[in-house]
């Protein structure tokens, strides 16, 4: 947990009092497209503003972004493409999203580094955990692109693994719904929001929040996950401040 007396980054003020000192924020790529293929600059700018507010509060923020606004390997496989090749295409999509978010964060005055699991030295650093931690300690945002660098692994699993390796306090899983429900709220009007639940229960009940590999990894290593609605402005700050939003998943 964060020291409540911690000074905001670069002398900038913030009304947030972070409950977590280091967080891993998982963003779905579909949100970056505003429901379309490609990037919606207005959406990326809005997310960057929210992250900047959190960084100014003194919290350390790392980010993993999906690539679903460009490619989804599993869906391309269903159309006849080789799964491994389509997954690599999806990884490149995550890098495009990462560079876009980096650009908008820099415009907010937040120093940002992109680290990729696939080497592409002209646009990003290679993924080096100790270097990532050092960037975070200096108040920089670190965005992890290209997933795990391996096919068959989702960006949800990447988020869980990166959170564990950099010593994050929590995975903040941003979604287009308010949290974990007993059923899909877009299909079942009687679905109820769960305020708290265990990793095991999510897996056993087959609740579609993230893939089972990500939840198993977090469960085995005691990593909490907060599932919340990114579409509500200011929710990233509320999540970092420890406010009662979304669903907290613990062991």
Swiss-Prot record:
Tell me which residues bind UMP. Answer: 67, 87, 148-155
* Cellular component, GO, one term: cytoplasm
- Give details on activation and inhibition: Inhibited by UTP.
Q: So, what pathway does this thing act in? A: Pyrimidine metabolism; CTP biosynthesis via de novo pathway; UDP from UMP (UMPK route): step 1/1
**Gene Ontology molecular function, alphabetical:** ATP binding; UMP kinase activity
User: Which residues are recorded as binding ATP?
Assistant: 26-29, 68, 72, 181, 184
Q: Name one Pfam family in it.
A: AA_kinase
Q: List the keywords (alphabetical).
A: ATP-binding, Cytoplasm, Kinase, Nucleotide-binding, Pyrimidine biosynthesis, Transferase
Annotated EC:
2.7.4.22
Query: What transmembrane ranges does the database entry give?
Result: none
Record localization: Cytoplasm
Bridged cysteine pairs (disulfide): none
Gene Ontology BP, a term: UDP biosynthetic process
Main location per the UniProt record: cytoplasm
Report which reactions are catalysed by this protein: UMP + ATP = UDP + ADP
Task: State its role.
Answer: Catalyzes the reversible phosphorylation of UMP to UDP.
Q: Which family does it belong to?
A: Belongs to the UMP kinase family.
How the protein assembles, per its UniProt entry? Answer: Homohexamer.
The protein here is known as Uridylate kinase
Q: What is the lineage of its organism?
A: Bacteria, Bacillati, Actinomycetota, Actinomycetes, Mycobacteriales
């Amino acid at each position: 947990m964060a020291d409540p007396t911690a000074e905001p980054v670069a002398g900038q003020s913030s009304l947030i009092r972070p409950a977590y000192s280091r967080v891993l924020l998982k963003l779905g790529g579909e949100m970056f497209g505003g429901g379309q293929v490609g990037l919606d600059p207005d959406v990326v700018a809005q997310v960057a503003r929210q992250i900047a507010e959190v960084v100014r509060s003194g919290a350390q923020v790392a980010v993993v972004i999906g690539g679903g606004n460009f490619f989804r390997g599993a869906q391309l496989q269903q159309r006849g493409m080789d799964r491994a090749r389509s997954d690599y295409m999806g990884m490149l999509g995550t890098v495009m999203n990462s560079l876009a978010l980096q650009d908008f964060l820099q415009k907010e005055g937040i120093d940002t580094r992109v680290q990729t699991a696939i080497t592409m030295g002209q646009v990003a650093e290679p993924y080096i955990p100790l270097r990532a931690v050092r960037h975070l300690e200096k108040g920089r945002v670190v965005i992890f692109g290209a997933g795990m660098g391996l096919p068959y692994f989702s960006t949800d699993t990447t988020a869980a693994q990166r959170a564990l390796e950099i010593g994050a306090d929590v995975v903040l899983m941003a979604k287009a719904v308010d949290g974990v429900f007993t059923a899909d709220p877009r299909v079942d009007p009687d679905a109820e929001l769960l305020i708290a639940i265990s990793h095991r229960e999510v897996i056993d009940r087959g609740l579609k929040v993230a893939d089972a590999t990500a939840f198993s990894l977090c469960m085995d290593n005691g990593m909490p996950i907060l599932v919340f609605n990114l579409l509500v402005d200011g929710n990233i700050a509320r999540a970092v401040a420890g406010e009662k939003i979304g669903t907290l998943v613990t062991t």
